[in-house]
């Protein structure tokens, strides 16, 4: 596609002074990317997936775009429904001009320019031309999943993985001499804390028991099972844990009463709700944090979001479909207490807080 004389994306995009230009072009531009948090598919990277069209790359699973499209009033049919891939792309093209001043606008045009050589702004008038141009390039050998990462000099790519995952795609990538990217898992165990949702939690405990070979019947056996999965992930190159919580739990002391209630909760298959989920989460999370410290891992905490606000979409589409929101929780005292509990015992791992 033709290059416009006044490109929105150019070599000095966002560089607003000669100093900024020098710092970026001389020092930063050629540095490798070490991506320690993403939601990329390890299967796509391990198999070097080729995509049939740009909608499969851009729109399938990208709930940030889905959220923007819903905000603009696009019908769900053209977001997650049965519309064709081209129809969904054109719905996105219709939305993009209205994302101005949102990072989606910048990301969209950076990706079009850097990955596909497209200088045009994406809108309903240019949408079909952009769609066809991207698809022609995607049919070639230089626009596979790995080639995208290699183009941006990604040398270390972490994915987000549940403790019950078998990590076979990370192993596949490691054993593939043609894969130039270090593909590693991260340990994301939100489901292990969701004791407030008894039915889902108990199903997850069954899965964790099966994959760890430990029958989970009390707190000790739960922590043993989690330790085995930490060890397994570590043996597969993991050095990062990740947690999504509305708030960190209140500090409390582990007691035999907590263990007894957890035993009863498991044996009764959640017939009664757990009386103090915060106490349970605190004890499990503190125990895990000590495991991370022992292994030299980094722990990440995503705090403050209200997840899955729309129960209708949660039921029909599942979790993480673009209906989260910012919460109004209090964090400072809980965060201070949690970190201090670990630091007092010299077991505080390196920590990243979002």
What spans do the regions from the language model cover?
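Long, well-ordered mid-to-C-terminal structural blocks that present hydrophobic/aromatic surfaces
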Residues: 271-354
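Metal-cofactor-binding active-site regions of metalloenzymes
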Residues: 2-295, 347-353
């Amino acid at each position: 596609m033709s290059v416009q004389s006044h490109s929105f994306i150019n070599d000095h995009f966002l560089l607003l002074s000669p100093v900024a230009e020098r710092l970026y072009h001389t020092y930063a531009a050629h540095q490798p990317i070490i991506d320690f948090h993403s939601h990329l598919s390890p299967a796509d990277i391990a198999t070097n997936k080729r995509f049939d069209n740009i909608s499969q790359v851009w729109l399938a699973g990208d709930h940030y775009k889905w959220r923007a499209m819903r905000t603009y009033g696009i019908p769900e049919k053209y977001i997650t429904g049965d519309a064709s891939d081209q129809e969904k792309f054109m719905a996105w093209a219709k939305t993009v001009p209205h994302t101005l001043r949102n990072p989606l606008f910048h990301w969209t045009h950076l990706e079009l320019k850097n990955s596909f050589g497209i200088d045009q702004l994406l809108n309903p008038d240019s949408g079909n031309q952009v769609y066809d141009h991207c698809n022609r390039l995607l049919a070639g050998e230089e626009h596979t999943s790995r080639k995208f990462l290699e183009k941006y000099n990604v040398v270390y790519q972490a994915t987000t993985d549940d403790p019950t995952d078998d990590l076979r795609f990370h192993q596949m990538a490691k054993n593939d001499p043609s894969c130039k990217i270090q593909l590693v898992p991260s340990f994301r165990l939100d489901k292990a804390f969701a004791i407030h949702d008894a039915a889902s939690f108990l199903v997850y405990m069954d899965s964790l028991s099966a994959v760890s070979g430990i029958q989970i019947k009390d707190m000790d056996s739960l922590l043993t099972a989690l330790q085995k999965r930490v060890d397994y992930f570590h043996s597969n190159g993991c050095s990062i844990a990740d947690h999504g919580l509305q708030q960190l739990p209140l500090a409390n002391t582990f007691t035999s009463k907590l263990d007894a209630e957890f035993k009863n909760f498991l044996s009764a298959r959640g017939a009664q709700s757990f009386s103090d989920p915060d106490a349970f989460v605190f004890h499990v999370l503190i125990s895990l944090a000590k495991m991370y410290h022992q292994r030299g891992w980094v722990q990440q905490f995503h705090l403050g979001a209200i997840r899955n606000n729309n129960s209708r979409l949660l039921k029909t589409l599942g979790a993480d479909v673009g209906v989260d929101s910012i919460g109004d929780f209090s964090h400072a005292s809980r965060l201070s207490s949690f970190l201090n509990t670990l630091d007092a015992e010299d077991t505080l791992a390196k920590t990243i807080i979002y």
